[in-house]
């Protein structure tokens, strides 16, 4: 499936504002919120601002490839582990996501939490909103969801090493282990790092070997 954060579903700025949730996250770091400047830097529509609108692409996928699921990345690229946001804010955000998707004849069943900031306290809201699956994290301490502020250098080092050397295991899963309770936790396997053309042949070899052995 393809995952979009739902501001991209708007056909124009008026629709973007119309579907914005009545409750908005009050992040400690205001730079995380797309609402801080009231969309001042967003132009009126797709033709003038293709960076902030994706409706023509979404409609193309919906109409030409109906078997291809379109999932949600939340309405506003919502960060579930950052300070200042609440469960009620998240529910309002997901309500807006479901509403604008339905207006485009799209039902949302799958969610990828932005920055992998999965929050177990919010899963009941997901279930209430009709979300059947979400992408969880690999089962290792350094992949545990946390805020940007709490992502330590030690965690970053382990995550990077794990892309090239098997530290956390193969991170492949039996279906019977995944299908337990709605919404189902479809854990991620690994972060696929970009190709390194210069000076990175050894790392490319290690990365591909890590993937193939799994």
Task: Identify the function of each model-found stretch.
Residues 1-2:
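Catalytic domains of carbohydrate-active enzymes, especially glycoside hydrolases
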Residues 5-119, 176-192, 214:
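Metal-dependent polysaccharide deacetylase catalytic core of the NodB/CE4 family, i.e.
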Residues 33-49, 112-213:
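Active-site-adjacent pocket scaffolds in enzyme catalytic domains
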